[in-house]
Regions:
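Pore-lining transmembrane helices
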Residues: 1-344
């Protein structure tokens, strides 16, 4: 059995599904729901400023269409991550769509994983491969979406609602907790974006999550500037702090500055500023400026919101992280080169 599974490139491990597949799910989300929401928001604001010109209406329609194709995008992304053969990969479009329709993003993910692995099992095993492989893939995807998807979506929504409610009741403690967990998830090989969307984080909880994620990205970008210079500043600051993961394993002390920055700024976000966000922006931090764009969407395109974003997501985490990292360098806990990232 092990040799057969190995031949089919089926790896039954948490790492393969919760890290590898979920990371690719996040790419599918970004290529559909998130980019679609950005396009739609941009088109709406252009209409507010200049009127309902044909181009702006076209962009709004494009954004809505792109958002609606979240399920197929997740299906293909997950199947690709699991090294699916061509027929399985293409059929996973249907599995992802069915999962999204019946169970939301989480349902799409589960349906895509199960249908892809079952499709891989039968792929190339019969002379009717061109019929049986896509049939097994779409059938198993739809069955999974129908019976498992709704339960998973309901469960995750309940957890998300509990987090949102708890953050509103205890903004200090929960703000810190949400910011820390989501920030660490962004830096670790876990998709904070997918997690936020599946939990449907919104309001103060989503705002705290954004602050925590931004603190990791901006914090690492600034505190490692002497090693990585401008290219690292951009890669970490608007790319992903996950690039520091190999260095964190070697020296966990480098994780302290950005994490502490998130802990300090989270209560300011929840108690003083009342920063809010939506599920699409909650787990993104400053990556591609998606977090700030979604904050504008929720809080309005105003000068006050711009100042809040600049201070809470960029300036404050940069200053706090730099002060702490320089202190850790001074006492010998961080050495030059400890935060050098591979950019080749």
């Amino acid at each position: 059995m092990k040799s057969f599974l190995a031949k089919k490139e089926i790896k039954l491990s948490w790492n393969n599904y919760l890290i590898n597949a979920m990371s690719h799910m996040a790419l599918g989300l970004f290529a559909s729901l998130i980019i679609g929401l950005i396009i739609k928001t941009m088109a709406e604001q252009l209409q507010n400023l200049f009127g309902e010109y044909t181009l702006f209406l076209f962009l709004e329609e494009l954004g809505v269409l792109t958002m609606g194709l979240m399920g197929p995008a997740i299906g293909v992304a997950v199947a690709f991550s699991l090294k699916a053969p061509k027929l399985v990969l293409f059929a996973a479009v249907v599995s992802g769509a069915a999962g999204a329709t019946l169970g939301g993003p989480a349902g799409s993910f589960i349906a895509a994983v199960i249908s892809t692995e079952l499709g891989k099992l039968i792929s190339g095993e019969t002379k009717l491969d061109i019929i049986l492989t896509p049939f097994v893939t779409v059938l198993s995807g739809f069955v999974t979406a129908s019976f498992v998807g709704p339960w998973i979506q309901t469960g995750l929504q309940s957890i998300g609602s509990l987090i949102i409610w708890a953050t509103e009741q205890q903004p200090l403690l929960m703000g810190i907790l949400v910011a820390t967990i989501m920030g660490l998830a962004l830096t670790a090989p876990i998709s904070s974006a997918a997690l936020a969307i599946m939990l449907e984080l919104e309001g103060l909880a989503a705002g705290a999550a954004t602050v925590g994620c931004a603190a990791q990205m901006v914090g690492f970008a600034v505190s490692s500037y002497r090693e990585n210079r401008w290219s690292g500043l951009i890669s970490l600051g608007i790319g992903t702090s996950m690039l520091q993961m190999p260095n964190i394993i070697k020296n966990p002390y480098i994780l302290i500055p950005p994490t502490v920055a998130g802990i300090i700024l989270a209560p300011i976000s929840t108690l003083l500023v009342g920063l809010i966000n939506n599920p699409a922006g909650a787990g993104m931090g400053t990556s591609g400026f998606v977090g700030p764009i979604m904050i504008f969407t929720e809080m309005g395109f105003t000068l006050e919101t711009l100042i809040i974003i600049i201070l809470l997501l960029i300036v404050a985490p940069a200053i706090i992280s730099l002060i702490l990292s320089e202190w850790l360098r001074k006492i010998g806990k961080i050495q030059f080169g400890d935060m050098k990232i591979n950019q080749s």
